[in-house]
Amino acid sequence: MTNEFHHVTVLLHETVDMLDIKPDGIYVDATLGGAGHSSYLLSQLSEKGHLYCFDQDQKAIDNAQVRLKDYIDKGMVTFIKDNFRNLKSNLEALGVSEIDGILYDLGVSSPQLDERERGFSYKQDAKLDMRMNEEASLTAYDVVNTYPYNDLVRIFFKYGEDKFSKQIARKIEQARQVKPIETTTELAEIIKSAKPAKELKKKGHPAKQIFQAIRIEVNDELGAADESIQEALDLLAVDGRISVITFHSLEDRLTKQLFKEASTVDVPKGLPFIPEDLQPKVALVNRKPILPSQEELEANNRSHSAKLRVAKKIRK
């Protein structure tokens, strides 16, 4: 692994093992990141199996080309540099119309958080950026400096669930009238100034939820996850499985809802029989999310909010 892209994989064995890997199957890692899940999944495949890896961050792909070299040399890996919302079109272009399993590790990866110049973290001073795809046009700077007050309030409430969204948006509006807000530290200080003193004494950084909200907006994370998971459920072969790791309530709620819609039937109660074409195509593998073990929680602080949900295809 390259030094620049160190990433501790969360729920490594649980996520892959729950896919019930077939050695000669076709699998997708929709969020390559540090390639931890990919490496473990590939170790379960024979040379007839294949893994398609998506990431929009070229640095993640460069790292994986080193880490997964032995499997690449055997022709077992294909990298796709694109947003996973384009899952189906990319796979179809490669002649893949059905898959045996897919995994998602949603949210920002550790290397992106740790790389100061990417501008994701309130803990390190950097230019406001937060793009997972460095070729994308919209940045955190654009959101903070150009979004109208009402739009800032909307995304802070919707994606950050911060009860001081209005006060924070007003402080941002006032500050940018004097000069543009350019760095993560500047923004974090403005957020802190908008919150009452008793809030600042609470556990956790006062800027965490707002930084999350801006990051989700910049990368359209929830929109992309919604589209991609729906495409994944469609692509799965019968008995194929999908594993999704989430790190905050918005992602988990979305995943839970998508799985629920696919695994339940929307018909009037009391019908003596449900027609074949109305039967659900998906079944939940775990009704309650799988959480990290105590051992993992102690070893990796970033695993604390992780939840794993798994579903399987039961008919086409």
From Swiss-Prot:
The listed locations are: Cytoplasm
Enzyme Commission code: 2.1.1.199
Q: Of which family is this protein a member?
A: Belongs to the methyltransferase superfamily. RsmH family.
Positions of S-adenosyl-L-methionine binding: A35, G36, H37, D55, F84, D105, Q112
One family from Pfam that matches here is: Methyltransf_5
Give the record's keywords alphabetically. Cytoplasm, Methyltransferase, rRNA processing, S-adenosyl-L-methionine, Transferase
Question: Which GO molecular function annotations are given, in alphabetical order?
Answer: rRNA (cytosine-N4-)-methyltransferase activity
User: What GO biological process term is on the record, naming one?
Assistant: rRNA base methylation
What's the top EC group for this one?
Answer: transferase
Q: What is its main location?
A: cytoplasm
Output the Gene Ontology cellular-component terms: cytoplasm
Origin: domain of life:
Bacteria
Q: Which reaction does it catalyse?
A: cytidine(1402) in 16S rRNA + S-adenosyl-L-methionine = N(4)-methylcytidine(1402) in 16S rRNA + S-adenosyl-L-homocysteine + H(+)
Function, as annotated, reads: Specifically methylates the N4 position of cytidine in position 1402 (C1402) of 16S rRNA.
Q: What is this protein called?
A: Ribosomal RNA small subunit methyltransferase H
